[in-house]
Amino acid sequence: MNVLPCSINTLKGLYDISGVEVGQHFYWQIGGFQVHAQVLITSWVVIAILLGSATVAVRNPQTIPTDGQNFFEYVLEFIRDLSKTQIGEEYGPWVPFIGTMFLFIFVSNWSGALLPWKIIQLPHGELAAPTNDINTTVALALPTSVAYFYAGLTKKGLGYFGKYIQPTPILLPINILEDFTKPLSLSFRLFGNILADELVVVVLVSLVPSVVPIPVMFLGLFTSGIQALIFATLAAAYIGESMEGHH
């Protein structure tokens, strides 16, 4: 089996998939490039919410923590425990990465249900959660792939590549393919679940009175949180796996 062309085709497929579009979209023309304005606008809003909330909560730490300080300390402790469980004792340097992934995805997912995006009128299309777009989920999955390769190479050097012939060299093609399919599974799982949730709510709102879809919206909030947790857990698990060198 020729592994290199297979790997190249997988990467090319991932690049092509990042151009998948659902519905109409609004673009900015910058030079010779078209920039996906909808995703950028909603992503900036999510980033502003995260930065603003963190700044307000911790700008003046108290000996007796305020409610906001308590909340952020709880979130940090949760992310540290998650990272330590999946990565091991060397989890420390990876807490910011895992935390950033979890918080951005969590707030992005919830923004699709809680923020009134539709009051902002665009020439084409409409605003929605950033994770409702395959371009965002691919952009989140690719740094995760780079992170676990970096973690493995930093910890084990070139010996990291020895894992591809474990437990037998016959599995070399499968082990290589597995690493290149991880970002595919991460991006499609997140994109598919968030898109499906928003579509279900839209359909129900259009078919039945506004009160009926409320339970579905609450279920969507729960599912959105679970999807953020799954993504962060898998990202940490992949990093821990690359550092330990076992499957």
Swiss-Prot record:
It is a multi-pass membrane protein. The chain crosses the membrane at residues 38-58, 95-115, 134-154, 199-219, 220-240. The keyword Protein transport does not apply. It is found in: Plastid, Chloroplast thylakoid membrane. One of its GO terms (cellular component) is proton-transporting ATP synthase complex. Key component of the proton channel; it plays a direct role in the translocation of protons across the membrane. This is ATP synthase subunit a, chloroplastic. It comes from Platanus occidentalis. The gene is atpI.
